[in-house]
Structures are given as structure tokens and as C-alpha cells.
Amino acid sequence: MKCHAKRTLAFLATALPLSGKSRACTRTPQSFASGFRAAAPFLFSRCFALCITHCALFHLPYSFTGFSFYFFVFFRLFLHWIYAFCICNSTYVYIYKQVLSLPVKSSMCPSRLSCSVWYRVILTYIYVHCFRWLVRNHLLS
């Protein structure tokens, strides 16, 4: 377990740009593959940990039945793999962390949307842009 944690931290440290400005990702497919092997156990465990947390956000029942539980877990895992690919773009990392650390207050939300809906809209926006960035920079090149 410690070995996986060290490799994951090394992967994250090399993936993050040194400057605060966002820049194009210059990592090779080979380095991404080795980084993914190191990060996969971390992302998988985080996926299970976030599963219950996001149940409240998405208003899902805590008692999952077989298929729905696995679908939800692996869907979250897929989204976090997209985030792992996007981690070398500091803008997305900054926005992602800021959104997850926001205290949800009624004064911060638009008047016609509840806070939970607004929170989901922001996260969906980030995931969509991460996916577009992934396709543009990795799948089409």
C-alpha cells in the first residue's frame, strides 16, 4: 500500500506544472501509462470513498442494489480518470479544488436554482471541459 501511495504522489508531482499558468501537457503516452498504473489504486479507493459522499449530493439512497451500486462506482471512477488525465492543466485542477472546497450557502447560489443543483451544474461543466481537453490533446493527436 505504501508503494502505491509513493508512486501516486510521484505521478501527481510530475504531472502538475511548476508555474501557476496553465500550459499544454507535454507528457508522453508512455509516461501517462506508467502514471496511470501507479494512480489507479489511489483513484479506485477514492472512488469508493466518494461514493457515499456524492450520494447526498445526487440525492441517491444509501442502500444500493447490485447493478446500480457497481454502475455508480465505476461511473465515478471513469470521471476521476478523466480528472487524472486533466491534472497537468493547472486551471482545471485549481477550479476543481475550489469547487469541492466551497461552503454551500444559499447566498452563493442563484435565486432560481437550489444549491445542490448549482453544485452539480458546476461539476458537470468541469467534467465536460476536462473531457474535451482530453479528446483534443490526447485522442486526436
From Swiss-Prot:
ATP binds at A15, L16, P17, L18, S19, G20, K21, S22. Induction: Repressed after alkaline pH stress. Keywords: ATP-binding, Membrane, Nucleotide-binding, Transmembrane, Transmembrane helix. It is a multi-pass membrane protein. It is found in: Membrane. One of its GO terms (cellular component) is membrane. One of its GO terms (molecular function) is ATP binding. Its main location: membrane. The chain crosses the membrane at residues 38-58, 67-87. Disruption phenotype: Growth defect under alkaline conditions and citric acid stress. Required for optimal growth under alkaline conditions. This is Uncharacterized protein YEL045C. The lineage of its organism: Eukaryota, Fungi, Dikarya, Ascomycota, Saccharomycotina.
